[in-house]
């Protein structure tokens, strides 16, 4: 029983390693990022640039997701992205921030200058 389970884990691990992206930067909570995403509109494809602050990160190997928040026309917009998705072409870190929380959901309740985060200098 144990060997069967272990063998199954090895097989799934090999398959996941095939589809993982290796060129992803180390993303932390509070980072401001700019991403290029492939959008399909009918039979056309185009690349859309998205930027925002990472407010949450859920690690689960191949299905690791990040939640990105941005204010658009005074409305907070949040989207969840799969990091290893083939639709994400590029991820660039614009600014790193110093935060003390694993999830920044409290930013939903704030507006204006209260949503600013302390910049981390290396």
UniProtKB/Swiss-Prot annotation:
Organism from which the protein derives: Gracilaria tenuistipitata var. liui (Red alga)
BP GO terms, sorted: translation
Annotated localization: Plastid, Chloroplast
Superkingdom of this protein's organism: Eukaryota
Pfam families cross-referenced by the UniProt entry: Ribosomal_L19
Keywords: Chloroplast, Plastid, Ribonucleoprotein, Ribosomal protein
UniProt name for this protein: Large ribosomal subunit protein bL19c
GO molecular function: structural constituent of ribosome
GO cellular component: chloroplast; mitochondrial large ribosomal subunit
């Amino acid at each position: 029983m144990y060997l069967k389970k272990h063998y199954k884990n090895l097989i799934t691990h090999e398959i996941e390693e095939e589809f993982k992206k290796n060129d992803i930067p180390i993303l932390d909570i509070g980072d401001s990022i700019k991403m290029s995403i492939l959008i399909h509109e009918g039979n056309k494809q185009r690349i859309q640039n998205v930027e925002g602050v990472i407010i949450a990160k859920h690690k689960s190997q191949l299905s690791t997701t990040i939640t990105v928040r941005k204010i658009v026309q005074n409305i907070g917009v949040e989207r969840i992205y799969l990091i290893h998705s083939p639709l994400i072409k590029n991820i660039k870190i614009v600014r790193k921030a110093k935060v003390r929380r694993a999830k920044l959901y409290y930013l939903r309740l704030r507006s204006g200058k209260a949503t600013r985060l302390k910049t981390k200098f290396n």
